[in-house]
Amino acid sequence: MLQCEQGHAPNATINTQMRSPMRVVVLSDTHAPRFWKTCPPAVAAQLSEADLILHAGDVCVPAVLDELAGFAPVRVVLGNNDGPDVAAWGAPETAEFDIDGLAVAMIHDSGPRIGRLPRLRRRFPQADLVVFGHSHIPWDESAGGLRILNPGSPTDKRRQPHGTIAVFDITDGRLERTELVDVS
């Protein structure tokens, strides 16, 4: 079971019989409409296999979330460029939830790179996985039972060679595969 805030029903519970493994696609920093005009084909190809979509903020317009929700249920947190319209879609500043036994937390800005993992461990002590965004720089680090993951940005790569998203599979509360995917 997945409890999920989606659309204009922020307290909605989505009960689904997910396949095993469960496929999760993670995006951040889409910055529509400046960089995201519509879902890029390489992103859509990954989303077509998703059971759940996580967006770590800087959506900028709720139409992106509506488009993503056409593929799978969406969890989203507010980014520093998101306004009341994205909040009204159901985006809190942080989120903590369970996916098939995996404790997940999401936040947009994780602070400076130095000390990030211990800082997120203190902020989300129950989490197995913390998803974050803001920097547009992919990041995947693990220590002491915590994994932190920034998917980068699919559309505003900044100083990175490619636009990226993250894809992972979950079975029985375990991350089985995590991949940063080039979507340029």
Go through the PLM ranges and name each one.
Residues 2-8, 12-74, 82-93, 101, ...:
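N-terminal active-site segment of His-dependent metallophosphoesterases
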Residues 94-95, 138, 166:
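Residue-level detector of beta-strand structural context in well-folded domains
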Residues 26-28, 52-58, 75-80, 106-108, ...:
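Active-site neighborhood of phospho(di)ester-bond hydrolases with catalytic His/Asp-centered motifs
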Residues 21, 27, 99-100, 122-126, ...:
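Binuclear metal-dependent phosphoesterase catalytic core
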Residues 62, 114, 139:
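Short glycine-rich, flexible loops that bind phosphorylated cofactors or substrates
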Residues 31-34, 82-126, 153-160:
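Active-site-proximal segments of metal-dependent phosphoesterases and phosphodiesterases across multiple
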Residues 68-71, 121-125, 143:
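Short, conserved loop/helix-junction motifs that constitute active-site signature segments
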